[in-house]
Amino acid sequence: SGAKVADGRIVATASGIAVAPHLVEIDPTTGVVTPLATPAAQPPQAGALTEVTATAEDGTALRAWLRLPDGTGPHPLVVFAHGGPWGSWNAWTYRWNPNPFVAAGYAVLMPDPAISTGYGQHMIDRGQHELGGAPFMDIMALTDAAVARVDIDAKRTAFSGGSYGGYMSNWVAGHTGDRFRCIVTHASLWDTESMGHTTDNSGWDGPMHVQNATYNPKDAVADIQVPMLVIHGDKDYRVPIAQGHALWYDLNTYSATPRDDHGRTQHRFLYFPDEGHWVLGRGNAEVWYRTFIDFLDEHVQGVSRQAPSTLG
């Protein structure tokens, strides 16, 4: 991800889906990569890592990574949709890290659909102008391939994502009925028509404007049937908090999600007054992971958890 050249030696930082950033030396003649000594060991990895493949409707080869808990399963599954939208799961992150979910007993599917990087310009172009089109269909194809495995429980699944992945979560919520038991959406685009006029990235308005009539998640709110956990930071200027507020209001006013036995909404809102587009504070990150996993436990596994003590 970064490199320095001195005395014929190339020193760089390298990382991957299961490897945190670390220093390496690259031989410019042979290309051999040698890890260098570091003061801290690599973070331990939970479970096992494998790949899932599928074929898109247009014949494009698709890939996802699948992190599996220990044991034979079948395991409950949570799907992670990446942000960007130009991105890939083939990178280390302390946000949206699968380890806590795997440790909690969940298999984690991380698909790279149309618009993902690392697969050539054609892959990006497939999804560039239809954010709820080919990327959605690719993710569903990879999810189908994952739940066909004997170690995955097809009846206990959830969907999630942040930023563009949150857009995808909202889109999935309105277009898959009760396929997933619950959906978690973080810093998400809900109303693309208003989003382009309020974000700090004004470049969004043009590309989104021509897609609003076809790919605006808000238009399918009446078809949302499952509980959603909405997460947003008040200091988010990339996807302003108004998107989260609008989503929360629309879910509780117009969605088809049934209320609980006491007539209360099953949707939840996790609000961070001091966070932006990313949740970076250590205590806040712990609350993020705990609340996320507790929501999965409640709706995927039928187990209620006590809210984290640090949750205000």
Regions found by a protein language model. Give the residues of each.
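Conserved beta-propeller blade repeats
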Residues: 1-13, 42-51, 97-99, 220
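Helix-coil-helix junctions within alpha-helical repeat/solenoid scaffolds
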Residues: 5-8, 25, 29
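Short loop/turn positions at the edges of beta-strands in beta-sheet-rich folds
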Residues: 17, 56-58, 177
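Structural motif
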Residues: 18-25
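Hydrophobic/aromatic beta-strand patches that form the interior of the parallel beta-sheet core
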Residues: 24, 52, 79, 109, ...
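Cap/lid segment of the alpha/beta-hydrolase catalytic domain
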Residues: 31, 37-163, 168, 190, ...
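Active-site-proximal cap/loop segments of hydrolase catalytic domains
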Residues: 113-312
